[in-house]
Structures are given as structure tokens and as C-alpha cells.
Swiss-Prot record:
Protein name: Deoxyguanosinetriphosphate triphosphohydrolase-like protein
Keywords carried by this UniProt record: Hydrolase
Annotated source species: Parvibaculum lavamentivorans (strain DS-1 / DSM 13023 / NCIMB 13966)
Source lineage: Bacteria, Pseudomonadati, Pseudomonadota, Alphaproteobacteria, Hyphomicrobiales
Coiled-coil regions listed: none
Pfam family of the protein (one): HD_assoc
Length: 396
């Protein structure tokens, strides 16, 4: 029988000892809960290790101090565990989902995803959440008896639904990314309901970490300065308070103090709003949380507006900055070049990636090439492009 997590004390917490199990049955551990085993499998996966060299905005060689997908995932997991602990949830499940949520991202961040989705337009498209599901259910080859990591139902559910129900009145299973729709035929993840509370915590921890650490990275890179932030609601107020509190403080310390305070403020808002929703809904189980008409975990309306203003600022001043655009344009060209060549000439793939292809230009070949490129790090994609296209590259 699965063992329990004694720290998950809330009646609405997901119970490790009551897990719906794994697709392939395995003996239970005598020392770890089901969700602790999921977390450990994620950490030991090849896809997780590669996050070290996958970036969100800046290509890997632009500086050692910018965040990678790996450092971001660790920051998300820290916030998620802290919030889950406050509410008596299963911290291990929240941590697992935080660590795994970016596994499906391409090299070069959203620019790489846009390029790969365009390449796959006639072959089912590309979606990073669906790719995460493919990785943990098919593409990791570490076990003798099954492909993937054989994670629990609760972890898979959280990975697919952390942003809310994916089947809605206006969206059927047929409209979903192919990987999710196909997996739904194998295992029912209850796609029309919300995810459990631990997944909801991980999703908002991602929002908190992403936005605030992009402020840090954008300021470090000189894409905007503190003065540009002063007109933003909440953000400008926090920076002003820090500068008033510590007159003459060096800029780097001002940034660290302000970002830390912003993260704390957003967490406090999340805690307050979620307590209010708990008092209203009074869920008695994780199933009650899934059946709610809105998320249990959330921000106040005011904080949601502040977040939207910050995202709009970052989109305009950071993600569309000409320096970022130049870098991302090059990155997209690399992805398109790699896909075009390898899809048309799959014999250029390593033998293990040729397996499952159906010839030049084939549908199965497209998905194999897509999986290959999506799993690349920024560094490997650049080097592979040079090997395939640069006649003077000694590695060709």
C-alpha cells in the first residue's frame, strides 16, 4: 500500500496514500511516497538535466547570470513548496509539478516553440505542454518495462491541467494538441475539471517567479531601467519604497531588494485570496477542489490587474526589444533549417532517431524530427546547425 505524507494535513489535500496509481503497476516504496518517487524520477531524467542549457529569453552564451529553464524551475519549486506548506497540501506533489512544468520547452524559448509549431503545422502542430506529456509518457527511455517515467495519475493530471480545464464547452478533445488527445484514449485525466490544489499552486508559483525574475534579467541586460518601471502599478511603488528605505543603495542591491519584496507581496496576496476562497467553498477533498467552478488558488482581482500590466510591459520592452528580436530571429532560423533538412533527409539523423520514421517528408518522420529538435539545448541546436550547414565546421 502507498505510504502517506504526514505533512499533507488539509482535508482537501491530495493524498499520496490514495493515489490513483500508475499506468504500469509497480511495487510501492517502503520509504518514499508516490509523489516523492515522481519527483525523483523527474530530477533523474535526461530532459530535466537539459534544462540547464535551455533559456527563456537570452540564448545560452549571452551570459552566465541570466536564468535558464533549470534555474527557473528550481525557483518555481521553492515558491510552490512554501505555499503548499501553508495550506497543508502535499508539498512533494507541488514540487514535482514545478520541476516538470518546463520539460517540453524547445531550445530558444518561445521563439523556438513558435518556429517548431510552424514547421509542424501540417503534422499536428507543436505545444510545449503536450510535449511535456510525451516526454514523461514516451520519450524518456530509462526503464525496462515501459517507456516514459510511469508517473502517477495525479502528476500527469497536474501537468496537463495546471492552467485549468482543457476540455470546455467551446473546446472538445478533438481540438486538443495531438499528444494530449491521444493520451486521453489511454488514461482518463478528467480533462473537463480543474486540477488538484497542488497543481494550482505550482501554476501560480510559475507566474510569480517568471514575471519577477524577468524584471531582474531585463534590468541586468539593460533592456530597460528602474525609471521605466516606476509607472507600473505595484512594481513602481515597491521600487520607490526600497529606494526611500535605503537612500544611496547601489542599483544591484535595489533590484534584489525590490524583486524579493515583489515576490513576497504576490505570495501574500495569493495566500489571502485563497483563504477567502477556502472559506467560501469549504472543500472536503481534492475531488471537491477539482469540481469547483473556478480555481481554488488564485490572486485578487487587483493583483491580477497588476500582473497583466507587468506582463504587457515585459512583452513590449523586453520580449520585443530589438536585441532580443535579433537573437530570436537567428534562433528561429536555426530551428526551421534543422527541421527542413532532417524532415527531408531523415538519414541524417542518428540511428536511434531514424527508428520510427516513415521516409522523407513523412508524418511519422515529422514527429520524430520534432521530438529530436524539441529536446535540444540551445548549445546543441547551434552546434548541430553548424555541423549540418557549415562546410568548414570540423565536426561536420
Amino acid at each position: 500500500m502507498p505510504i502517506a505524507n504526514p505533512a499533507a494535513t488539509a482535508p482537501y489535500a491530495t493524498r499520496a496514500e490514495e493515489t490513483r496509481g500508475r499506468l504500469f503497476q509497480e511495487p510501492e516504496s517502503a520509504t518514499r511516497t508516490a509523489f516523492q518517487r515522481d519527483r525523483d524520477r523527474i530530477i533523474h531524467s535526461g530532459a530535466f538535466r537539459r534544462l540547464k542549457y535551455k533559456t527563456q529569453v537570452f540564448v545560452y552564451h549571452e551570459g552566465d547570470n541570466y536564468r535558464t529553464r533549470l534555474s527557473h524551475s528550481l525557483e518555481v519549486s521553492q515558491i510552490a513548496r512554501s505555499v503548499a506548506r501553508v495550506f497543508g497540501l502535499d508539498e512533494d506533489l507541488s514540487e514535482t509539478l514545478a520541476l516538470a512544468h518546463d520539460l517540453g520547452h524547445t531550445p530558444f524559448g518561445h521563439a523556438g516553440e513558435t518556429a517548431l509549431d510552424s514547421c509542424m503545422r501540417d503534422f499536428g502542430g507543436f505545444d510545449h505542454n503536450a510535449q511535456t506529456l510525451r516526454i514523461v509518457t514516451k520519450l524518456e527511455h530509462r526503464y525496462a518495462r515501459f517507456d516514459g517515467l510511469n508517473l502517477t495519475w495525479e502528476t500527469l493530471e497536474g501537468l496537463v491541467k495546471h492552467n485549468g480545464p482543457v476540455v470546455t464547452p467551446g473546446r472538445s478533445i478533438a481540438d486538443l494538441p495531438r499528444a494530449i488527445a491521444e493520451y486521453a484514449e489511454t488514461q482518463d485525466l478528467e480533462l473537463a475539471t480543474y486540477a488538484g490544489p497542488e497543481a494550482q499552486v505550482a501554476a501560480l508559483a510559475d507566474d510569480i517567479a517568471y514575471n519577477n525574475h524577468d524584471i531582474d534579467d531585463g534590468l541586468r541586460a539593460g533592456l530597460f531601467d528602474i525609471e521605466d518601471l516606476m509607472a507600473l502599478p505595484l512594481v513602481g511603488d515597491v521600487f520607490q519604497r526600497v529606494m526611500d528605505r535605503y537612500p544611496g543603495l547601489e542599483t544591484t542591491r535595489v533590484i534584489h531588494e525590490a524583486v524579493r519584496e515583489l515576490i513576497g507581496t504576490m505570495i501574500e496576496d495569493l495566500l489571502s485570496e485563497t483563504r477567502s476562497r477556502l472559506a467560501e467553498a469549504r472543500p472536503r477533498s481534492a475531488a471537491d477542489v477539482r469540481a469547483m467552478s473556478r480555481p481554488l488558488v488564485g490572486f485578487t482581482a487587483e493583483m491580477t490587474e497588476h500582473n497583466a500590466a507587468l506582463k504587457a510591459f515585459l512583452f513590449e520592452r523586453m520580449y520585443r526589444h530589438y536585441r532580443v528580436n535579433r537573437s530570436m530571429s537567428k534562433a528561429q532560423r536555426i530551428v526551421r533549417d534543422l527541421f527542413s533538412l532532417l524532415h527531408g533527409e531523415p538519414d541524417q539523423l542518428a540511428p536511434e532517431w531514424q527508428a520510427g520514421c516513415d521516409g522523407p517528408g513523412g508524418i511519422k518522420t515529422a514527429r520524430r524530427v520534432c521530438d529530436f529538435i524539441a529536446g535540444m539545448t540551445d548549445k546543441f541546436a547551434i552546434e548541430e546547425h553548424a555541423r549540418l550547414f557549415d562546410l568548414h565546421d570540423p565536426r561536420a
